[in-house]
Amino acid sequence: DSRDSIIYQVELNGNLKNALYEFADKADDSLCNIQANDLLEQILDSDGYYITFNYTHTLEEIYDIPWEQILHIHGEVGEDNLELGYPKGNFKPEKYTYDARGKGRGPYVETEIEEHINGIEDYYVRTAYTELIDKCKSFYKEMRIDLLKDFLDKNQCKIEEIIVYGHSCAIDFDYFSYLNKRYSNAYWKFYVRGAEQESNVQYLIMENSIKNPDIIKV
């Protein structure tokens, strides 16, 4: 049955590992076509230490940061260690937004994605979406505080300022919490783009009682 094939196709596409490695390799190969960001060039310090959540070698190749000063906390291209997913128990997909009148003019209503899926009448479509959500939930990554600690210990890092750029601050809370506990008197600079990221940062600051934060809109 062609309708059953919808569900079967979802099951086939459950393994994203190969796609992730291919995506990361292509992104790394494209670095030769990317120009340095002016603001980042001002922010980055060649003597600083960097925790990047990026798989690619952007810092090394575009901004000439020595590789010894960089920790790829989620893995890096060229190594068999790429991680994808959410911290366990922290799966928070975006809400589903739809036009209540179906005329393209609103009003627009937000609902939890799983609530929307449960309301789909078509069995095949509902089952396919449920399979996809379940697979997304299964993609979780372990927090590697041990890697972060070893990196900081090895480099004997004495940190006075912590700069956060290009991170949504919606996940990876444990890393920020560890840094705040280890360097409790450090000055924090959060570069944010948009209201949602700013809200995430404010929550992060409040939850971790960060003493000296500064939020900079870009």
What do the predicted segments below correspond to?
Residues R144-V218:
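SIR2/sirtuin-family catalytic core signature
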Residues E121-D146, S209-V218:
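Extended charged low-complexity segments that act as oligomerization/scaffolding linkers
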Residues Y21-E22, E41-S46, I133-K135, I159-V164:
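N-terminal start-of-chain detector that recognizes signal peptides
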Residues D28-L39, C136-K154:
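A Trp-anchored, charged/polar loop motif used as the substrate-binding/catalytic surface
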Residues D1-A128:
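Extended, H/D-rich, highly charged conserved domains that either
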Residues S5, T56, I62-D64, K135-L148, ...:
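Proteins with a high burden of low-complexity, intrinsically disordered sequence enriched in S/T/G/P/A and R
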Residues Y21-F23, F53, F91, F139, ...:
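Phenylalanine-focused residue identity feature
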